[in-house]
Amino acid sequence: MYAIIETGGKQIKVEAGQEIYVEKLGVEADEVVTFDKVLFVGGENVKVGAPFVDGATVTAKVVKEGRAKKIVVFKLKAKKNYRRKQGHRQPYTKLVVEAINA
């Protein structure tokens, strides 16, 4: 069984036991998080939400919070001596999906 959930402005396909990375939730490690914005539940009997499936939830356990690898944003205007260098590390939360309740 799998489901498609919405979190952090993104849609993520999840299965029980899967590790996923989502936008930072601001939750302590080892806490349980419940997602109620379930768009789709697949398996033996398929349920499609309009926009969300009624009564469907996905529970996940928080493993850790961290920051992704650094990316470099470099702006340059040719022949004008304009250069700007900026780095960014996106915060994330690592989860392990425990159950899909449909």
Curated annotation (Swiss-Prot):
Ribosomal protein as a keyword of this entry, yes or no, is yes
A single cellular component GO annotation? ribonucleoprotein complex
GO molecular function annotations of the record: rRNA binding; structural constituent of ribosome
Cystines in this chain: none
Pfam families hit by this protein: Ribosomal_L21p
Which Gene Ontology BP terms does the record give? translation
Alphabetical keyword list:
Ribonucleoprotein, Ribosomal protein, RNA-binding, rRNA-binding
Q: Which family does it belong to?
A: Belongs to the bacterial ribosomal protein bL21 family.
Assembly mode: Part of the 50S ribosomal subunit. Contacts protein L20.
Describe the task this protein carries out: This protein binds to 23S rRNA in the presence of protein L20.
Know the name of this protein?
A: Large ribosomal subunit protein bL21
Can you name the source organism?
Lysinibacillus sphaericus (strain C3-41)
